[in-house]
Amino acid sequence: MNYGFKKISTFMALVFGLALIFELPYIRNSFYVPICQALNLTNQEFGVLSSIYSLVSLVMYIVGGFLSDRFNSRWLLFLPFAGTGALGFWFSGFPEYGELKIIFALMGITTVMTFYSTAIRILKGLGSRYEQGRIFGWMEAGKGIFAGLAFFV
């Protein structure tokens, strides 16, 4: 793999994006009790929110693969950040349970349908078929490093 500046910067930006965009829907892993208390949610209600996100995400993997092959990658990377950011802003306003269902469903769309599939397609194009294992291994390692650093910031 030719490790030019453009490839390395593209790789780092995508890995950073992959690490951070999934922090919001999976925030429950770190702040489960405080979120339940702040939003006045029961364990069952929070479980339903997680299920909504997971089910929407499952369907969106198929749709995302189709979209990433047919539309401009720049837009498919920009829109999820803007959409997830707007959903995070809405989430920070202590919404009602019905609104939370909408937020988590929309996060399944913004994080998986438009971002994940496009990021994976671009990462795949950064190296030959013999380098895919190394690229995806470094991607997973980088996601862990960036997510860990973001936790402390």
Give residue spans per PLM region.
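Pair of pore-lining "gating" transmembrane helices in MFS-fold secondary transporters
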Residues: 3-31
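Central cavity-lining transmembrane alpha-helices of secondary-active solute carriers
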Residues: 48-66
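C-terminal ends and interior cores of transmembrane alpha-helices
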Residues: 82-96
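Hydrophobic core of transmembrane alpha-helices in multi-pass small-molecule transporters
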Residues: 87, 99-114
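Intracellular juxtamembrane helix-capping segments at the cytosolic ends
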Residues: 113-128
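Glycine-rich segments within core transmembrane alpha-helices of 12-TM secondary carriers
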Residues: 133-153
